[in-house]
Amino acid sequence: MKHLFSLFAAVCLAGTMMAQDYQLVWNEDFTDASLDNQVWNIEVNGDGGGNNELQYYYEGGVKLDVEPTTGKHCLVLTATKEDYMGKKCTSGRVNTKGKMYYTFGRIDARIKFPNTANGLWPAFWQMGNNFDQVGWPRCGETDLIELGHQSAFGKGTQDRYFNGAMHVGSKWDAVWSDAKSVTWPYSVEDTFHIVTMIWTPTSIDMYMDKDAHPELEPYFHADLEPNDNADYDRSIVFGKPNFIIANVAIGGNFPGIFNISNVTALANGPRSMYIDWIRIYQQGNAQETFVCPTASDPIEPENTQGIETVWDDEPGQKILRNGQLLIRRGEHVYTITGQIVK
């Protein structure tokens, strides 16, 4: 994971976010040789995700590679029709549980979703980091985007139909869900798009391509309202640290397909979801939290007061930080508060 920006890119990002007083706290651009296991977990299981999914998730469905059309370095999750561990198909799923988690802020992800046709179910989402302690649905689930729902089958709108959702409850059969589906004006598959969620103590809003279309309303909005029952109190459940998840499921309850022979999306070979980058921004208020191993290790300070060019570690890469106290560990440079800037 590299946290390296050209000065021009950093200024552009800062200018975009300053209007809402958000500052970049985490950038995952997937340019390393392998996935950073200090931050990411690769899931290995064939349990169906609680949704009767068909795939076996394993390491072979996850890699860092170049997206062939754009040349972008990406996290690649690939769904494949093949026999493996008693299943007829495989895929990839990753998460940051127990490693990188945060409370409140803005999260953006630039993703190229596969052609879902009938049968693929790609998603980018998050759950409460207390999952191991309280389980689902008590931990809360927020789906920033899911594609591939059966409602679009037969309408020719699979590439434009998606939803955002929230789920919480006391047990599996007592779940409160709030899901909003939309048929978008244009296709969101097979090219890169930016999915955004703005999460505050009082609300959650989700946007598609907010950078290119700032005038568009959120496709999902929810107020985080209190409730007398703590298991359903959205202000409490969705006011705790969350980790992020990305996956490409095959079949299951969402697409309503339970036999690999009915998964038309894989008829001509594997399909992949490409994630170019993920960024988290925060405002620096007391209610926000952010935890990441690369930002929390003990580090030694170095005073760069008055130094115009700070550390030229790679040819052509210079970070300008006049008059600031930075701290450094390994390949990363941090502000004194622990926010990664390189």
Where are these regions (language model features)?
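Sec/Tat signal peptide C-region and signal peptidase I cleavage site
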Residues: L13-A19
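Boundary of Sec targeting at the N-terminus
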Residues: A19-Q20, Q339
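GH16 jelly-roll
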Residues: Q20-E300
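C-terminal outer-membrane/trafficking sorting elements
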Residues: P301-K342
